[in-house]
């Protein structure tokens, strides 16, 4: 079955199987390994991508659900011209990662929040990141990273 959609700004036109998840399609057919396979049940958030700007669990979507007008963004799609995005920069600055397994999903979820709400409260950040699990950091540095990203965005406006 042929599908077509935009991935990080570039059109993808590929064959897929009717039962293939978007997660497996991205990892196995397109070699986008930043999208992690964690629980495979939509509970951990490591497979998070942005679909038309909204965070979604790619393990819960079938690749055949993608349409020509859909845009999927992975962590690779955030850096422009070799420059890290404000959220990536903030995570690096505030050490909002440790092993890195959850980091792409955290960053994409944080980006979606800041796109919608440029000055979130700590509680709003916690609420948005609720479905993204981290086993390493204890979340404090992740929260600080999102707050710092909001500051960076405000300073650049």
What residues fall within each predicted segment?
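Signature of N-terminal electron-transfer/Fe-S-associated modules in redox systems
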Residues: 1-157
């Amino acid at each position: 079955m042929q599908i077509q959609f935009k991935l990080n700004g570039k059109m993808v036109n590929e064959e897929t199987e009717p039962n293939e998840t978007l997660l497996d399609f991205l990892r196995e057919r397109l070699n986008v390994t930043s999208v992690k396979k964690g629980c495979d049940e939509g509970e951990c958030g490591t497979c998070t991508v942005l679909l038309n700007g909204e965070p979604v669990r790619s393990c819960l979507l079938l690749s055949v659900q993608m349409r020509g007008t859909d845009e999927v963004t992975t962590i690779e799609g955030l850096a422009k011209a070799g420059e890290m995005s404000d959220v990536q920069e903030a995570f690096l600055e505030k050490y909002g990662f440790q092993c890195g397994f959850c980091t792409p999903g955290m960053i994409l979820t944080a980006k979606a929040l800041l796109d919608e709400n440029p000055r979130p409260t700590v509680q709003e950040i916690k609420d948005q990141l609720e479905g993204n699990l981290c086993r390493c950091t204890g979340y404090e540095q992740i929260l600080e990273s999102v707050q710092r990203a909001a500051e960076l965005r405000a300073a650049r406006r």
